[in-house]
Regions:
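Proteins enriched for Cys/Gly/acidic motifs involved in redox and nucleic-acid/cofactor modification
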Residues: 2-250, 289, 326-337, 361, ...
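Terminal RNA-binding accessory module
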Residues: 5-7, 12-15, 20, 34-35, ...
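Conserved SAM/AdoMet-binding glycine-rich loop
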Residues: 117-122, 129-131, 234-357, 368
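Structural recognition of alpha->loop->beta junctions
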Residues: 137-152, 262-273, 296-301, 362-374
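Short flexible coil/turn linkers enriched for glycine and charged/polar residues
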Residues: 188-191, 201-203, 300, 310, ...
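Conserved, mostly hydrophobic/aromatic
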Residues: 205, 225, 242, 278, ...
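A structural motif corresponding to the C-terminal lobe/cap of the Radical SAM core domain
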Residues: 300-302, 314-430, 435, 442, ...
Length: 483
């Protein structure tokens, strides 16, 4: 039998949820990323594999991680067997997200045994959790380096100490630090880009782990964002998606500037880039200026992801969402009036602790009223350290699943209705490339963020083309390219 590879960490800085919960009145500093010369070239002739889970925030972070690694000389690979360094950029949002990562880490052990020089790293939101770190030490003691969401910039030092000095470290900061501008970035796409506009979240929805794993809300300066979008436009990018956990809180932390998300959208809409999207919006903070900017800005796409979570006022209150069903519906009405044809998508949690049949029916009735054209629906998952994890939840697993199925059945009918409205119409599609399911078809997204499959040998990735929609389904549409 091969010996189990077990790592004892040479240095440990472990996360603390208690520390992470606190919000300090400290000014945000902006720092530039610099790669120290001793870290250059240590990845030469070595390959890395990055496995990313979770939201767009993590996808964007992974592009920075890849940028840093390539600056250090590493080159990318697709197969675990070829890798000298495997990094898991993880998500902690629900228990099943965590289980997936642990499953993958368990599976990776065999590569560690085959290649004793393989380095394994873990970062992202799970690294910010105390129980994850405990579990790593106990059950997966072959991970070489652990770092958190607040210190991606530490990666070169951690790789260096593990690879060159054979010192393995856990290095997780519980409290957010400076905003790093000019991080190296290796963008996945040549025509669609993520642009972080802010970090962290101060909403503290009672079910959610994000305010603990991502720290307090910190906005990037408008000039830096505008400059980045201008550069992307110049480089031929067709679409940018502005990122933040609660983009509508953008700018609220500026002490010297009265500048909000609406102002930013207005300014960005003047840049010559075809498509601007953003995610995610918090319904309470979505204001008139933002709606006006969406209505006026020709390049602000007519799609809004506005997570409602529940249709019951009682549950919204227990979730600490700080808006009522009526206020949410008012905003939807305003959006539909000011931006005719806007597509609205959402997130919904079922079986939140104490959710009664009546509460759940309120959610169903809200779905009928809004007619969402897309949604992510979840069964509530308790997160250690969040208030809701201590609330009583008497529902059985079967009852929870039943609610999810019932909700999905209803909501899917509106996905179809939302796409049917485009049958026979001509829409603009940003071409993504080959369809995953059918190599003879191309695929892309409309302005309303709906997937279209079509056949053509004349168009290429990154083109914005006109398509006539021939058939609509719940999850996608078929189209024909119009000359
Ligand atoms: N900041 C965004 C996204 C947060 S995470 C927002 O506020 O909308 C994405 C979604 O995951 C949430 O909208 C919520 O529906 C879901 N979610 C978050 N925590 C959850 C939990 N503990 N159990 C189940 N779903 C959860
Ligand atoms: Fe989580 Fe709420 Fe913040 Fe979204 S707004 S990240 S759901 S705490
Ligand atoms: Fe997951 Fe963290 Fe994003 S918990 S959803 S990766 S902010």
């Amino acid at each position: 039998m091969k010996k189990k590879v077990t790592i004892n960490y040479d240095e440990e800085l472990n996360p603390s949820i208690k520390e992470a919960r606190m919000r300090r009145n400290k000014d945000v500093n902006f720092t530039s990323f610099i790669l120290e010369p001793q870290y250059l070239n240590i990845g030469l002739n070595k390959k890395y594999l990055l496995k990313t889970y979770g939201c767009q925030g993590n996808l964007a972070d992974s592009e920075n991680i890849a940028g840093i690694l390539e600056l250090m000389g590493f080159s990318p690979c697709n197969e675990e067997i070829d890798a000298d360094l495997i990094i898991f950029n993880t998500c902690a949002i629900r228990e099943n997200a965590e289980e997936r990562v642990f499953g993958e880490i368990g599976r990776i052990e065999k590569f560690r045994k085959q290649n004793p020089n393989l380095l394994i790293g873990l970062c992202g939101c799970m690294a910010q959790e105390e129980h994850t770190i405990e579990k790593i030490k106990k059950t997966y003691p072959y991970i070489n380096i652990v770092f958190g969401t607040h210190n991606i910039y530490s990666l070169p030092e951690l790789v260096y100490s593990s690879l060159i000095e054979q010192k393995n470290k856990i290095d997780v900061l519980s409290i957010e630090g400076d905003i790093y501008e000019n991080m190296p970035v290796k963008r996945e796409s040549k025509y669609k880009a993520w642009v972080n506009i802010m970090y962290g979240c101060d909403e503290f929805c009672t079910y959610c782990i994000v305010p603990y794993t991502r720290g307090k809300e910190r906005s990037r300066r408008p000039e830096a964002i505008i400059e980045e979008v201008k550069e992307l436009a110049k480089a031929g990018y067709k679409e940018v998606t502005l990122l933040g956990q609660n983009v509508n809180a953008y700018g609220k932390d500026f002490k010297d500037l009265n500048y909000t998300f609406g102002n930013l959208l207005m300014d960005l809409s003047k840049i010559d880039i075809p498509r601007i999207r953003y995610t995610t919006s918090h319904p309470r903070d979505l204001d008139d200026l933002t709606i006006d900017a969406m209505a006026l800005g020709k390049n602000i796409m007519p799609h809004l992801h506005l997570p409602v979570q529940s249709g019951s006022n009682e549950i919204l209150k227990k979730m600490n969402r700080k808006y009522t069903r009526e206020e949410y519906l008012d905003k939807i009405k305003k959006l539909k009036e000011k931006i005719p044809g806007i597509s609205i998508t959402t997130d919904i949690i079922v079986a939140f602790p104490t959710e009664t049949e009546e509460d759940f029916n309120e959610t169903l009735s809200l779905v009928k009223e809004v007619e969402f054209e897309g949604a992510y629906t979840f069964i509530y998952s308790p997160r250690i350290g969040t208030p809701a994890a201590t609330y009583p939840n008497p529902l059985t697993e079967d009852e929870k699943k039943e609610r999810l199925l019932k909700l999905n059945d209803l909501i899917n009918s509106y996905f179809l209705k939302g796409r049917k409205r485009f049958e026979g119409k001509i829409v603009e599609v940003l071409v993504d490339g080959e369809s995953k399911n059918n190599k003879d078809m191309l695929t892309g997204y409309t302005e309303h963020n709906m997937l279209v499959n079509f056949a053509s040998n004349k168009v290429k990735e990154g083109d914005i083309i006109k398509c006539k929609i021939t058939k609509a389904y719940s999850w996608h549409m078929l189209g024909e390219v119009v000359e």
